[in-house]
Amino acid sequence: MKRIVLDASAVMAFFENRTGAEKVEELIGLAVQGKGELLMSVVNWGEVYYSIWRTKGEAAAKTALAEIAQLPIQIVLADFEVTKLAAEFKAQHKLPYADCFVAALTKLRRASLMATDRDFRAVARVISLQLI
């Protein structure tokens, strides 16, 4: 594992113990050992926050954010460069706009994207993709 960008779908799988949770847990363990780097776009971090809030309530959402803060995941802000590339992905591919941010971060950081969302197949020729 070198550098992995986690999509909201992968983080949600981890928190909800769904298919792929064990892979995310393995990556977290490797990052703790210093054997790789985990990144997440702040836009996708926000997706996790609102998704948990909608399904489990505000308290659960705030607890999840506190738990994410304890994990070896670097939350990357959406600066001009990331936002520009996200907009270009949106213009060229059938992909939700929030997903374009994680794709842009993946490309700019020369990383591999870990996701459960099959929509990312639309950009699989442009970025390294690992579907779980």
Where does each model-flagged region fall?
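Short, well-structured N-terminal submotif of metal-dependent ribonuclease cores
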Residues: 1-40, 53-66, 130-132
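Acidic, PIN/NYN-like endoribonuclease modules and their adjacent C-terminal/linker elements
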Residues: 1-3, 103-132
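A generic structural signal for short hydrophobic patches within well-formed alpha-helices
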Residues: 11-12, 45, 120-121
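Short beta->alpha linker loops
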Residues: 19, 43-44, 78-81, 101, ...
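Anion (oxyanion) recognition and catalysis
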Residues: 32, 69, 107
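Helix-loop "lid/cap" segments that line or gate small-molecule binding pockets
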Residues: 51-54, 72
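Active-site neighborhoods of divalent-metal-dependent phosphate/nucleic-acid chemistry enzymes
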Residues: 74-114
